[in-house]
Amino acid sequence: MWTALVLIWIFSLSLSESHAASNDPRNFVPNKMWKGLVKRNASVETVDNKTSEDVTMAAASPVTLTKGTSAAHLNSMEVTTEDTSRTDVSEPATSGGAADGVTSIAPTAVASSTTAASITTAASSMTVASSAPTTAASSTTVASIAPTTAASSMTAASSTPMTLALPAPTSTSTGRTPSTTATGHPSLSTALAQVPKSSALPRTATLATLATRAQTVATTANTSSPMSTRPSPSKHMPSDTAASPVPPMRPQAQGPISQVSVDQPVVNTTNKSTPMPSNTTPEPAPTPTVVTTTKAQAREPTASPVPVPHTSPIPEMEAMSPTTQPSPMPYTQRAAGPGTSQAPEQVETEATPGTDSTGPTPRSSGGTKMPATDSCQPSTQGQYMVVTTEPLTQAVVDKTLLLVVLLLGVTLFITVLVLFALQAYESYKKKDYTQVDYLINGMYADSEM
């Protein structure tokens, strides 16, 4: 089977090179496919005829490049895509010719040829549905082709995943045709998402992806294709219904590339449900905050009167500093300050002011003593002159010592001056003596005299 598929693929490559020279190499096909994905998602959002036609032109050509069933199939698909932009009615004939070409080129695998024939019809129906959804004739042709493609999609999903190893994109097109007839646009996004996988990955990966997705598409085909094949407007009606939930799907449906039309309302319901918890979550969020604020407010007033008497030593300190400025009344005022909280302290402070200073000390031993002493210092300046004179006596002693030292220094200086004056006077008396007298006598004459 693999050898037959490889031979068919090589033969298709040779025919593709001979009949139609592709401008772009096959290495860049996945890039085109992803570009087609982006464009297809844009067309799903806008749901316009022109955008859908452009998308089919951009997406179908890379699909044909990646298809490996036959070269004639590639060429015929390119011709059909070119014809889709021009004429819509002539496409089923070209698709039928493409199917004949495919069957003639692939005589080895009958099942693959039949699936290829159904695939080509499905692809042509896709191009017709995507390129010209407004024409009634093309819609009827798609409607007539859709049952066969639905049946072929069922067979492709159930019986021929083995033959769909290389022509995986085409098999996905067969699985997509009912979904395109049902929803129109999102199926192409799945097709484009699957094409690079089927073109680059081996058969096992394609079987895994195609078996799951084609089965889901086949199940939706059973539900959606009969609705779409009966009248042509029914095809447009689900497309409109699919287009209506598409705008809310934009952030999510484009990312995972919605596979089935059934997934769209599911995503819509999730979109609808997600804002509800998001809205509800902030609503309870402020309510506990309000509760906490009310609790904090309730706690603050309750805590504020209670610790005021307990923490009163700190305000007592503040109150003590101004109240102790008048010397006779500091203790009574301090007793009146905390007296509002504790009455027995008033009696104790009135009886013994010393105990009042020791009263706040058990509350805060070091805090109240310091301001008490600080407050007592300015008050005691008027009360205890003896206490204040002690540093003054020391200063006077220091000053007296300095004065004594000055007097001693002055007396010494005066004595030195007197001595110098006496010596000067003596020298002045002896100025008349000459040097000869001094030499002869050895002394001054006045000294003897």
Swiss-Prot record:
Coiled-coil region list: none
Keywords in alphabetical order: Cell membrane, Glycoprotein, Golgi apparatus, Membrane, Signal, Transmembrane, Transmembrane helix
Name this polypeptide is given: Uncharacterized protein C11orf24
Subcellular location: Cell membrane; Golgi apparatus, trans-Golgi network membrane
Gene: C11orf24
Cytoplasmic topological intervals: 422-449
Region annotation Disordered: where it falls in the sequence: 72-101, 154-187, 215-381
Glycosylated residues in this chain: 49
GO CC, one annotated term: intracellular membrane-bounded organelle
Residue stretches spanning the membrane: 401-421
Polar residues composition-biased segments: 255-279, 352-367
Leader sequence segment: 1-20
InterPro entries: DUF5585, Erythrocyte_Invasion_ImmMod
Record carries keyword Cell membrane: yes
